[in-house]
């Protein structure tokens, strides 16, 4: 994991927090997929996990796609 996608386990519950609150947690960077894949592997490999909560830091869950990134690759 990295600073953008935080992985926290409390008992059988894992909380994944998207942590770009200054820009409302957009998705779309290439490393976003890698981070979610890594988190999924950790969850799948841990037989104790019964629940995964996906949340966003700050005032918004997620603004959606990262428009700045999309404009840069178009």
Regions found by a protein language model. Give the residues of each.
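Conserved CoA-thioester-binding segment of acyl-CoA-metabolizing enzymes
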Residues: 1-57, 71-73
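Short, active-site-adjacent cap segments at secondary-structure transitions
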Residues: 59-63
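Short, flexible, mixed-charge acidic loops at enzyme active sites
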Residues: 64-74
